[in-house]
Amino acid sequence: MMSRKSVIQRNLKRISICDRLKSKREKLRAIIKDQSISMNDRFLAQVKLSKLPRDSSYIRIRNRCLITGRPRGCYRKFKVSRIVLRQLGSIGQIPGLTKSSW
């Protein structure tokens, strides 16, 4: 069973926003952590960081299967769920993946 298309699209939108604002977020975070910068400047950086969209944080991205959109049991290396991995592996669609036997 596939996830709703809106849920998959929402996650893809979060990925694109995160990629777009990653450098800005990292710079602000570095300013906040730097003790040599004045407290006022660090506070302003904290305010700017909090005004960035919530979805620009990588924490909000869910690791989903590319084929079914399944949120759990998803292998990062192949970007598919365990169920799809087994199906594709059994018909030889994933290079280098062989059925184990001993």
From Swiss-Prot:
The keyword NAD does not apply. Pfam families: Ribosomal_S14 (PF00253). It comes from the Bacteria. InterPro entries: Ribosomal_uS14, Ribosomal_uS14_bac/plastid, Ribosomal_uS14_CS. One of its GO terms (cellular component) is cytoplasm. Coiled coil: none annotated. Keywords: Ribonucleoprotein, Ribosomal protein, RNA-binding, rRNA-binding. PROSITE patterns: RIBOSOMAL_S14. One of its GO terms (biological process) is translation. One of its GO terms (molecular function) is rRNA binding. Belongs to the universal ribosomal protein uS14 family. Binds 16S rRNA, required for the assembly of 30S particles and may also be responsible for determining the conformation of the 16S rRNA at the A site. Part of the 30S ribosomal subunit. Contacts proteins S3 and S10. This is Small ribosomal subunit protein uS14.
